[in-house]
């Protein structure tokens, strides 16, 4: 169910590689579902279950969904997405990467290293990686997966090496509210993270993160970053790449030339390097793999140009991610004009001020209505976006709210060769960036 989704389509591909007959359904089937080459039904209907013996559903699907009810009535096995992923990861030596920010990129970097090492990794990714290609790769070697901490079931996943890039208050429901894919509180999120990490043979966390250090006290952990087992020296941040010397406490591991910009990607690379060491990769494979990592789709992805301006698409949807992506964009020396689509009403209600603070370094900001992802909130998508735009104006930054078509027309009419047009958000803002380039 929901086979067009990045996670569900990846699981479908991996099941097919094991000889499992797969069908799917989705409210809006698209290119991912078509690329699988399997029967895909449009919409949801209990009649889709005629010949199946297992139904795999995304976590937010409620137990009273008609297809779930029908599946149980027929005695079919019903698995949540995370339960199926846990089944896959338990079968071989594995690494699971989680965290509020950077987990997709870090997982992709780790996959690139293991490919370079010739270890034939099995990969599950929450994004598109050209090296795979796509969002999944069958393989006979170590199993590498992005483990989404927004899903409370992630605490039950067991891996050999557990990587936590960071942990912040995201996917936490406001007091008194409940929603699928939201933890009841920050403490509930921390407890779930502890459960995931405690089940691993090796835990990889940043040495400079007091919260994760406290959470992993007493666990078999290995630390990266300043004060850890591996760190970066001679870091050079340039508009198109990031170079540094990768150092282990026992000696240098090699020179790394990342093709992706931003200091946050140094953090991600260090996490991937230490996890790769734990899985048996050589220092040479680590430095080469990181240097050949092409980036993940929608992570500072330059999709083209319009009027001489660069058009960049990024998935950032939390204030910390937004600020890191903006800082990377500013390295270009161009006038950075942000087209930001907040994602989810509950998140935006809680973090609207933090979003404004994260965006204030841009030369100009256009705020689109919140992409609700089906949520209901106390305020409308337009009102919340208005609040962010007005706060940015108070902070002295040119800002306005526009709907998607207005924003597209405005970007097209005002793009200049000195601009970098940065489209950010986890919703459908990516389609605007691509339309701008393709339609000119």
In which residue ranges do the predicted regions lie?
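ATP-dependent carboxylate-amine ligase
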Residues: 1-32, 36-40, 51, 55, ...
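Hydrophobic anchor at the beta1->P-loop junction of P-loop NTPases
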Residues: 95-97
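Short glycine-rich, flexible loops that bind phosphorylated cofactors or substrates
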Residues: 63-65, 152-153, 170-171, 212, ...
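Switch II (G3) loop of P-loop NTPases
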Residues: 142-150, 311-317
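Conserved motor-coupling elements within RecA-like helicase/translocase cores
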Residues: 137-139
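Acidic, Mg2+-coordinating active-site environments of NTP-dependent enzymes
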Residues: 33-37, 41, 47-57, 61-80, ...
